[in-house]
Amino acid sequence: MSSLSKEAALVHEALVARGLETPLRPPVHEMDNETRKRLISGHMTEIMQLLNLDLSDDSLMETPHRIAKMYVDEIFSGLDYANFPKITVIENKMKVDEMVTVRDITLTSTCEHHFVTIDGKATVAYIPKDSVIGLSKINRIVQFFAQRPQVQERLTQQILTALQTLLGTNNVAVSIDAVHYCVKARGIRDATSATTTTSLGGLFKSSQNTRQEFLRAVRHHN
């Protein structure tokens, strides 16, 4: 982790300490992304051939490569902390001590059980202490952790822990409302249900008034 930004390393360490890091095995050896994509493409070719798909067809010919590129560069890019967003934490010179809330954060992730889409929105709030964060950075942190194979409960807590670590305060709350395509597109095929998860820290957990203020913001979003 020595080549990572200080912020990325701190967040990773905090998640490991809380048992919230995504299950990852230690790499057998260092591998660059182009090699990783080449190997994934090869395995994807085998899977498609086992499904009796004709990869000589011009519609399917590049599919293994496209999937490999999508996995490494896009939907699973959050597995690599080298992609952790550059974070700007600013001294709280204005002494802001009221809740800051960001609603309707677009979130697209992947269910780690079936590798199909999780599609939803997040609401994130915090009460500043000594530092505030650029608002777009909250969206970027949500997107970073969404770009992994995930379960929604862990994703919610990872975002909370990352912001607590970076802002130096426990007063953070996160709520995610999402549709899981492992429920919508397979199995029970329920097209209308959604899952809501909430993780509360500091005053959001201990103060009923603060908690209710946050939950009202969440309900307003819904």
Swiss-Prot record:
Pfam families: GTP_cyclohydroI. GO terms for biological process: one-carbon metabolic process; tetrahydrobiopterin biosynthetic process; tetrahydrofolate biosynthetic process. Pathway: Cofactor biosynthesis; 7,8-dihydroneopterin triphosphate biosynthesis; 7,8-dihydroneopterin triphosphate from GTP: step 1/1. It comes from the Bacteria. Its EC number is 3.5.4.16. InterPro entries: GTP-CH-I_C/QueF, GTP-CH-I_N, GTP_CycHdrlase_I, GTP_CycHdrlase_I_CS, GTP_CycHdrlase_I_dom. One of its GO terms (molecular function) is GTP binding. It catalyses: GTP + H2O = 7,8-dihydroneopterin 3'-triphosphate + formate + H(+). One of its GO terms (cellular component) is cytoplasm. It is an enzyme of class 3 (hydrolase). Zn(2+) binds at residues 111, 114, 182. Keywords: GTP-binding, Hydrolase, Metal-binding, Nucleotide-binding, One-carbon metabolism, Zinc. Belongs to the GTP cyclohydrolase I family. PANTHER family: GTP CYCLOHYDROLASE 1 (PTHR11109:SF7), GTP CYCLOHYDROLASE I (PTHR11109). NCBIfam families: folE (TIGR00063), PRK09347.1-1 (NF006824), PRK09347.1-2 (NF006825), PRK09347.1-3 (NF006826). Toroid-shaped homodecamer, composed of two pentamers of five dimers. This is GTP cyclohydrolase 1. It comes from Citrobacter koseri (strain ATCC BAA-895 / CDC 4225-83 / SGSC4696).
